[in-house]
Every structure is written in C-alpha cells, then in structure tokens.
Amino acid sequence: MLAFFLPVFLLSLMIGLPVFFGLLAAPGILLWLNEQPRDLALLYRNVYNGMDSFPLMAIPFFMLAGVLMNRGGITTRLVEFSQAIMGHFRGGLAHVNILSSMLFAGLSGSAVADTSAIGSMLIPAMVKNGYTRKFSAAITAASSVIGPIIPPSGIMIIYSYVMGESVAALFLAGIIPGVLVGLGLMLMTWVMAQRYDFPVATKRSTWSERGNASMKAFFPLMTPVIILGGILGGVFTPTEASAVAVAYSLVISLFVLKSMVIRDLPKVLTEAAMTSSVVLLLVGAAMAFKTVVSLSHTPEILAEWILTLSENPLILLFLINLLLFLVGMFLDAGPAIIILAPILGPIFINLGVHPVHFAIIMSVNLTVGLATPPMGLVLFVASSVSGERIESISKAILPFLAIEVVVIFMITYIPAVSLAIPRYFGFIIGG
C-alpha cells in the first residue's frame, strides 16, 4: 500500500496539483479502483470531520490576531523596537530582522506571515543600506522559521489535536528552541558581518530613545504574555486564549493605538479567512488521508520496518531527523504532522523519548524544512517579496540552515532544551 500511496502523492505534486488534492488523490484513486463508492463518500466526509474540532478553532483566531496586529501597524513598532536595541551593531539590520521575527512569532505563529510582514519592511531597507538583495531575502526566510516554534504556534495546536498532548506544554516546550534558533542566526550574522564588513544601521540609541521605542511596542509585546499567562494561570484554555488574543488585538488597534478604523475590518477578516481556510482544508485532507492509510495497516508496516533499521534510539533519532527534514521541504508542516505523528510518535515514545520532546523534534524539523531548498515554501514567499531569484536565495541561505540543523541536533540529543520549561511549570512530571 505504501508503494501506491507515496508515488501517487508525489506525482500529484509534480504535475502541479495543490497539496489538498494531492492528499486526497492517492486514497481516492485506491478506493475507486476497488469499486468502493461508499468508502469514497466516507473519505470526503472525513475531510469535514477532520476540520470540525473545537481545539482547531484556535488556528483561525490566532491568524486573525496576527492579521489585526500587522494591519494595525504593529510590525512597524516591533521593528523600531528591535532597531533601538540592536541597530548599532555591525550588521545591525540583519540582527533587527532576526529579533523582529522572534517578537513577531509571539503574535502570528506563522513562518509565511513573518516572511511577508517583516520582509516587506526590512528587505528594501537592508538593500538601501548596502546589503545584497539575496542576503536580505535569505536572512528573512531563515529567521521566519522561528514563527511556528515560539508560541503561539499553529503546528503545535495541530500536533496536540492529533496526538492528545497538552497545548500549553507544547507552547512552553517551544520557547527555548525558538530562542536558540534566533541566537544561532545572530551568531552566524555576526561572523559574516566581521568577514564581509556589513554596515551599521544606526548610531547607538540613547536610553531615552530605547524607552520611547519600548513604550510604542509595549501593547504588542504584551500579547504573548497575556496568552501564556492566561493559559498557565488556568484563566482560559488555549482555544479561548486565541479568542482573547483577537479581542486584545482589536481593542489596541482600533481604540488604543488608533492605527485601524472600522472600515478596515472587512479586508482584515477576508485575509484571515482565506489564510486559515487553506490551513484547515489541508488539515481536513490530511485527516482523510490518514484514515485510509490506517485502514491499509501502512503505519504498522512502516513502524516494523523502521525498527529493523536499528535498535539504538540515538541512531533512529538521527534517521528520523533526516526523514522529517526532507519531508518538510515538500509538504507543509500541518499535514505532515497529521500523517506522520501517529506513525512515528508511538515508536519513539516506546523507545523512551518523552512525547513532548518528540513533538518539538518533529515540529522544528518540519519548520526548518519550510526554508530549505529547493521547495521550501518561505523561499518562494521571500522571492516574491524581494524580487530575487529563488536560486540565489537558496545559495545565500545555506549558512543559516547549517546553524538551524545544529540547533535541531541540540534539541534531539539534549531533552532539557525542550522539556525544562514545561517541567518547571508542572506540565511534565518525572521523565
């Protein structure tokens, strides 16, 4: 069965079918060939059932909050804050780009939204200040992968939905890995800045200027604090937190900062609806794909095959990192998690890997795949925003991908990187 599903799915992608149809093509064709029209109808019913979930409501709400923040000029305030903190370093705008992505991650949780919002502001500014266009696009794409790692994160919500893990535990587990990716990118930027004599963006800001920038960014920076604080304090669930984030974003954009007016709302709602509908359709299709694959006993066959490769968990973790990294190049993280997590998760949990630890290994690998040549999605977004050819961006991003791979191995072989914070807050007991 696996020999049928995989080639049909890959062929559908190669001929240009959207991923949604590709995920339905293989099981649909199989059921049609077997003359099982009732099961074929059940397949498409599973698409609806896959989206009909209360926890998944958090995804469109968080996306709407991110769009509200972006349309409300919040991105500009975050960039100004980052520039006041780091603009005076050599290679300052590259550092500003990375720090802005880390801050924006707490608002949107999306790599594509990060690339579009931060890139449209900083890539032209970086080019104007003497950076090459390909480098500017590459650092934007590389830093955008922080978005789905630092909470709130759409892919963590999907993982929780599929595997039954605590969303709060997954959110907390992503904090240190996300910060490590950001610090690693800053280190590589510093090395390159010394070698290639990158320009300094601004003179050192005074404490007064930093204070002013901090005040302007105060309300946006409070968004992740409110979300995580409310969840950890038991005030609301992660799904309710997403609705609170929308209400908070709406109030500060319309009434506090007054950076939006009521007539902007239809455009904001339309943009958020279109973005979230794409994600939810992929989730529904992936759930239908997973259902048919499970009926064919493919997961059990694949699990047995993986265990024949080695009995050493460290070697298996290395191999699974490689697999997930490759999958992330071609398939969006959400559908990949829905399809692969139920197959791979139990294998490694039985080998002694903590469920939350494996969730972060999987999520970070698939997220970094978004920025990996030749098919990484954010490379196409960065190319569109910057006007630079994908081939040039792909070459320029390689040093940053090397850093992100190092962080992946740190996460994999040092469990405390992902487990320390959720254990501290009591979401993980023992193990």
Task: Give, region by region, the residue ranges found by the protein language model.
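Alpha-helical transmembrane segments of multi-pass membrane transport proteins
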Residues: 1-431
